[in-house]
Amino acid sequence: MTKERDKFCIIQLSDLHCGDSRFDKALVDNALEEINSKRPDLVVIPGDLTADGYRDQFEEAREYISQIACPQVVTVAGNHDCRNVGFLHFEDLFGSRNKTVDFDFCVYCEEIFQEKVKVVAVDSNKPDLNDGEVGRGKYDRIREQFRGKNDYKIFVLHHHLVSVPGTGRERNIVWDAGDVLMELRKVEVDLVLAGHRHVPYIWPIAGMLIINSGTVCTWRTRGYTKPSYNIIEISATEIDIQIMMPGGEILNRERYSRVHPKKRLPLDK
């Protein structure tokens, strides 16, 4: 039996855009050092590893990602990765664009028994388009993979399911967002992790926390938004989310009840 622990740590980082003119290696180096110091249980990278989907850009991204010291790293493709038929290079270097992983959770909660972490990651891209769609062909897989009653359920995709403030005219929510949200609600998903628009934000909706990450290592930012990644720590009673700029600055922090995710907790510690 795996030993219980106080917290389960997830690092969420996305939109590396290797090959972009505004890519900043110093941000990558700082992020890698900070991430490895946290010794995360899971790292989720929801897309846009590259600027244009070229193989050398994927190889550069793989070099950085290989330096992450974590037994579980889940990577999905973004819209930039699918440019120039880049999804073929993604599959060569990172495997399937649709993934499922599960492993021991071991953070005991008196009110909710959750024994395993189940991560279901899907490709939401339309090649050479910025728009996305999960697609009805994947709904059965979502239902099947999330059928367990005692799993902590995490859904990963690149595109947004809900609009994100500060991103201008929102055109990049997946085409079937409403249907996807309904499916996730029915199977009682706990977390939805996405990237795409370079603005981090947290939405508590229908018992889920929908957490978007910014761009971790480019200056392709909007307004006063800074490069960032997310630290998500799950304890027996709460979910603590910190939005971090590589280099150590905490840009935002929010806490939610694990039992009642729509209930936001005060930052009293």
What is each PLM-predicted segment?
Residues 1-66, 141, 148:
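N-terminal active-site segment of His-dependent metallophosphoesterases
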Residues 2-11, 109-121, 147-154, 204-210:
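Beta-strand-turn-beta hairpins that frame and shape the catalytic cleft
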Residues 12-14, 43-48, 73-79, 123, ...:
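Active-site neighborhood of phospho(di)ester-bond hydrolases with catalytic His/Asp-centered motifs
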Residues 19-22, 51-56, 79-88, 127-130, ...:
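Active-site environment of divalent metal-dependent phosphoester hydrolases
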Residues 59-141, 182-185, 230-231:
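Extended active-site neighborhood of metal-dependent phosphoesterases/phosphodiesterases
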Residues 149-166:
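Short acidic, glycine-rich surface-loop motifs adjacent to enzyme active sites
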Residues 169-240:
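Conserved beta-sheet core of the metallophosphoesterase superfamily
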Residues 234-269:
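A short C-terminal boundary segment appended to hydrolase-like catalytic domains
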